[in-house]
Amino acid sequence: MITLTGHTLTIEEMKRLLLEGEGVTACPNSMQKVAECREVVEKIVEDGKVVYGITTGFGKFSDVLIQKDDVKALQHNLIQSHACGIGDPFPEEVSRGMLILRANTMLKGVSGVRPLVVNMLLEFVNRKIHPVVPQQGSLGASGDLAPLSHLALVLLGEGEVFYKGKRVHAMVALTEEGLEPIELEAKEGLALINGTQAMTAQGVLSYIEAEATAYQAEFIASMTIEGLQGIIDAFDENVHKARGYKEQVEVASRIRDILHDSKLTTKQGKLRVQDAYSLRCIPQVHGASWQVLNYVKEKLEIEMNAATDNPLIFDGGEKVISGGNFHGQPIAFAMDFLKVGMAELANISERRIERLVNPQLNDLPPFLSPEPGLQSGAMIMQYAAASLVSENKTLAHPASVDSIPSSANQEDHVSMGTIASRHAHQIIQNVRRVLSIEMICAMQAAEYRGIENMSTVTKSFYHQGRQQVPSITNDRIFSTDIENIAYWLKTNYSIKERLDVNAAL
């Protein structure tokens, strides 16, 4: 059970919450702050003060005063009218993440909701009732209005949820769990939907998968080095310390550890003086992607604990301030950066695939075919990798450079952060498939070299891979092989976390 405080949530905790289904509870001190802040909102309503989002309309209607008797209707109308999401739903892990992050930000005690609302969000998390939230429709400022409205709907007993493996109406799940839908009161609708939790939840899942994929890329690249009898000198510690980037030094160190007892690597000048860049520059390129990942993780952990709704309430109600923390620009930039960093791992992987299958670049059978000419072997797998890499280049175009005004030009600059976050996740799926193709080719090359000559670690990794796909002894439908390896990489926890060379043994 992970305790939410509004201040301390980490990526490591989100891994447990999203991937392992761990439950959550609220810090009592934080809940006390929620209750105290709520008293301020109720006094504002009682006194008839004019405060945006509490006693006024929204967006362009911010100058429209709402009567006390209409305050509840205002919140309900807000949720229904803003539930304009379209397209396929976010993965369940993302909608679960949205619930967690929305609760966490409310626990900062500046949003003005009742403790009841926070508790309801936590009930949904712990009972694994996950909102069906369409992926498209958010501009990323005023936060993720459309996606979060679909989240808010289910608290009211409306909309759909994923529950026990099925997609059902929210009331089906609430009834089975013995829960009553809530009725929103002043400010609560706005507090639920005015924030960056959709782009951030998708960003967190994307980061978790990207981190795992980056580690896996080092295993796979190491096996390719063996298949091509790569020069190990290029990974010498002195070379990388001379550059000074810690991530580059770390990648080189991990690859040295993986290959330390390999009989398939060579020394400088033995077979050739230098390797091509796709082998020789693995630490420099992969290390640069790790720099991106480290940046993204830092920004996500800030946003996971950020108050991003509007207005915010401070100093016991002395200050009720309309600001712009809902603007998703920091996450939009981070997700666009993640797109570029991950796409580059696929770029260099595809070039290693080419070196594995091109007979002009190695002494292996052409396209790793068991019978060159009669059988095409891995020829078209390289085409598939090239296609995915090309698609990534389109997806990597920054979403954050775009902005379209909305709400009659009141919201005249937006982040498009949710588009960036969604595209980052698509790129990661493509990267994983490119790496799967490289792994299939690298395993085949290793067989031609003699698997008994592989390092202890890569040999173990090879045998795990061969449990997913057989050796290429005849042409077959390789699409299935690629998807099998990709699924294994996505779900295999022994290589999903930090690269421990002993974990593969």
UniProtKB/Swiss-Prot annotation:
The modification 2,3-didehydroalanine (Ser) is found at S142. The keyword Lyase applies. Signal peptide: none annotated. InterPro entries: Aromatic_Lyase (IPR001106), Fumarase/histidase_N (IPR024083), HutH (IPR005921), L-Aspartase-like (IPR008948), Phe/His_NH3-lyase_AS (IPR022313). Pathway: Amino-acid degradation; L-histidine degradation into L-glutamate; N-formimidoyl-L-glutamate from L-histidine: step 1/3. It catalyses: L-histidine = trans-urocanate + NH4(+). GO terms for biological process: L-histidine catabolic process to glutamate and formamide; L-histidine catabolic process to glutamate and formate. GO terms for cellular component: cytoplasm. There is a cross-link at A141-G143 (5-imidazolinone (Ala-Gly)). Belongs to the PAL/histidase family. This is Histidine ammonia-lyase. The gene is hutH.
